[in-house]
Amino acid sequence: MQTRITSLRHARTAIRILAACVVAAMMLPTIGACTSPRIAGRAESEHQVSECEIAYRSATAGDERARTAPLLERYLAVSSSAQAWQTVAAICPQRLSEGIIRSAQAQWNAQNIADSLSTTYTASTADGNALRRQRLDGVTSLPLDNTTLRHLALAEDRAGSAMQLLAAKNAPGATLTLSDNHHAAGSQLMTLAGNNGDLRQKEYDVSALIANPSTATDHNTGLTAASAAIVEMDCTLEELAALSAAGQAPATGDAATRTQQMLTVIRLVTGHCYQAFANGYPSGDFAVFASTSKQ
């Protein structure tokens, strides 16, 4: 009899333990529900989208439309994209080279589409709002340190001397106007640098140009292109390297003013990149981004 009572007690104890476990398991979701729930989209909404991200999204969206839209819409898209990529270059330091090259590509595409539509692409006008510049007339300040300005001046002067030689040899794409513009930009940049520590040289090694005034092998890509096109691309890459390593001058004025000043430099370099395309340098990513990767 005692054994039977003991067995019943053990059974009841086991049942109580099992019941307690079941209740505890049922309460776990309720306990979890008492913690702060994650509101869908909360983290996303708390992320502050930067001006750089907004500009980059706008530029890439324009590129996408340019790939898929009908011809007229493509023209409008690449025209808009050209401006958007310059904004990216101005406010996203880590995307400066990409922004300049993409803008030049977009402008070159716009020019080609304009030709197909028998219209005129006007981004090359000489006013301060143009997307391309060849010189810095009227510019009195740039948000760059003097060392960077001196290296930009050297690149312009080197290109000017090379273009002068090619123009004298009647090389395709080479003109004295291009040479004069490069030399003028170099002088203007040195003036902005205070005319101290001038890196420009009276003579440059032009033996390769003398031997190959019409076409040459681009040392950056191994591709054959017009010598005048390679001169413009070399100038572009030299200036991109200088800007990528640039320090900023002491802040003077508001951020909007500095952005506008930076756009002036960006449009100068964009102009050289575009001119390289116009002279026959390949405008595809396989060429231009292979070149920048070696800088």
What residues fall within each predicted segment?
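Sec-dependent bacterial lipoprotein signal peptides
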Residues: 1-34
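All-alpha RGS (Regulator of G-protein Signaling) helical domain and cognate RGS-like helical scaffolds
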Residues: 2-4, 34-295
